[in-house]
Amino acid sequence: MAIRIFAILFSIFSLATFAHAQEGTLERSDWRKFFSEFQAKGTIVVADERQADRAMLVFDPVRSKKRYSPASTFKIPHTLFALDAGAVRDEFQIFRWDGVNRGFAGHNQDQDLRSAMRNSTVWVYELFAKEIGDDKARRYLKKIDYGNADPSTSNGDYWIEGSLAISAQEQIAFLRKLYRNELPFRVEHQRLVKDLMIVEAGRNWILRAKTGWEGRMGWWVGWVEWPTGSVFFALNIDTPNRMDDLFKREAIVRAILRSIEALPPNPAVNSDAAR
């Protein structure tokens, strides 16, 4: 609860210090060492708003513009859709587990929004998708200009196995709008989603993020809030070794963020979500 109250106050302060400025792009080919350390192939985009020039830092600019399935990073906008459509009332509503064993203990239990986000509980979001419907989902996607805005699918969930796709650059654009409460949804819903995204918090910083994985590639997207400005990030990597590669997402991002002092060198003093 203390973290949540601090997060709200800190966000208000951070937003108050935000000022628009011209932004350039700087290729960071030297970041290859972080990917090489973990034998990973991928891209990362970092938008550092602490700096006066507000540079967009990119490793592998070509890949950063290539669209991939958002996988569970889509839970960020999907939660907004569900709240707006009335598929869920608030973070306290309980979704009863149907008793089907889904191979992961975190999924085999009753859920609320917080646990569904933390555990990436797909079945809860499948309920939302059914309630929202394809036509309304398409309208929402176009309304927020999310990737290719295509929720079509021949089999499975459209955000994992369907046509929906988004690039790392586009993830950054979406996250920035959410951070500033500029998406076409109620401000209280945007604030709730940001609260659900909290991973860690220190004395003067907050890390909000979401993982994603569709089998062949994985994401970690989010931002770190500081009093001097926020640092947004979107990474995707190939995962040829499947689950054995998943730890690399956060490991690479954390190493890069620490290298630019966007995360402290030591582990966070508080953790609100196991990833």
UniProtKB/Swiss-Prot annotation:
Q: Which reaction does it catalyse?
A: a beta-lactam + H2O = a substituted beta-amino acid
Transferase as a keyword of this entry, yes or no, is no
Catalytic positions are: 72
For whether the record's keyword set contains Signal, the answer is yes
Q: Which InterPro entries match?
A: Beta-lactam/transpept-like, Beta-lactam_class-D_AS, PCN-bd_Tpept
Keywords recorded for this protein, A-Z: Antibiotic resistance, Hydrolase, Plasmid, Signal
Q: Where is the signal peptide?
A: 1-21
**GO molecular function list:** beta-lactamase activity; penicillin binding
Q: Binding residues for substrate, per the UniProt record?
A: 210-212
Against Gene3D superfamilies, the record matches this protein to: DD-peptidase/beta-lactamase superfamily
Q: What is this protein called?
A: Beta-lactamase OXA-2
Biological source species:
Salmonella typhimurium
